[in-house]
């Protein structure tokens, strides 16, 4: 099988393929390293990041339904300073684009 060019350009951002993670459930990807090679993704879309740390919603945050589950975490995040100091250096070690979900 020959190599197929799967590169895409989205609003001027060149990605090697259109595969990206869903914001929220993937965090910044640390927990998924043993399951997913981040180098193979077109981009990592990180969990929402706010200027200040945000504790999110009170429990319960998850409700099971017949067809799956619903969640309402409430954009819990450690804030921009933590993200810049910890998550950006982690993500930069991979050959993939970083899409930051800015909330607040």
Model-derived features: positions:
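N-terminal capping/small domains of soluble enzymes
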Residues: 1-97, 103
């Amino acid at each position: 099988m020959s190599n197929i060019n799967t590169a895409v350009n989205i609003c001027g951002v060149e990605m090697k393929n259109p595969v990206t993670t869903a914001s929220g459930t993937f965090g910044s990807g640390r927990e998924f390293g043993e399951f997913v090679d981040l180098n193979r993704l077109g981009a990592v879309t990180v969990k929402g990041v706010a200027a200040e740390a945000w504790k999110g919603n009170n429990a319960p945050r998850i409700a099971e339904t017949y067809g799956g589950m619903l969640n309402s975490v409430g954009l819990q995040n450690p804030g921009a300073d933590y993200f810049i100091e910890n998550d950006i250096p982690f993500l930069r070690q991979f050959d993939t684009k970083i899409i930051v979900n800015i909330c607040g």
